[in-house]
Amino acid sequence: MAARLLWAVRRRMQPLAAHAASEGRGWLHPFSTATQRTAGEDCNSEDPPDELGPSLAERALKLKAVKLEKEVQDLTVRYQRAVADSENIRRRTQRCVEDAKIFGIQSFCKDLVEVADILEKTTECISEETEPADQKLTLEKIFRGLSLLEAKLKSVFAKHGLEKMTPIGDKYDPHEHELICHVPAGVGVQPGTVAFVRQDGYKLHGRTIRLAQVEVAVESQRRL
């Protein structure tokens, strides 16, 4: 009797056990889904660094842009200063050139003042009220004054590199001589040479600044 009762209980429990087993498998599915979700979230947890990547790169570019902008501003300031300095140098140079043009002959003029003083003293010797007896003395003073004036003038010219050209007997040179006419070659005068100087020429430090006006000797008797 007890054995039959135990068999009946087991038989009734089998469907419940089967149902419980099927339910148990269903219960496992949610846990597996949650596990999958958790794993997926864990896998996706590495995505944020990828999302932060562009942000860091953008930051670096902005910093670089700011740095370049500062460099551009610095270079602009330097350029403006260089332009200003160049303009100042140009103005100073121009002023120096203008001063050189104006005051370049200052030393020469200072020496000429002494010549003017001698000339003034010489002319003071001449007076309308000079007595006939004093004319000889006056002429002597004038002669001495003019001689002193000539000597002083030559000294001033030599000091400043001004040289007088008196090319009598020199071969005609169109770079130094201005031909006025031809004259017959006389005794001791070679054709093609300067026979007579009408006006002296001048050189300044070896450079001709005024041609000498000359007459050149030729073999022909014809005067041009």
UniProtKB/Swiss-Prot annotation:
GO terms for cellular component: PAM complex, Tim23 associated import motor. The keyword Lipid biosynthesis does not apply. Signal peptide: none annotated. GO terms for biological process: protein folding; protein import into mitochondrial matrix. PROSITE patterns: GRPE. Probable component of the PAM complex at least composed of a mitochondrial HSP70 protein, GRPEL1 or GRPEL2, TIMM44, TIMM16/PAM16 and TIMM14/DNAJC19. This is GrpE protein homolog 2, mitochondrial. It comes from Bos taurus.
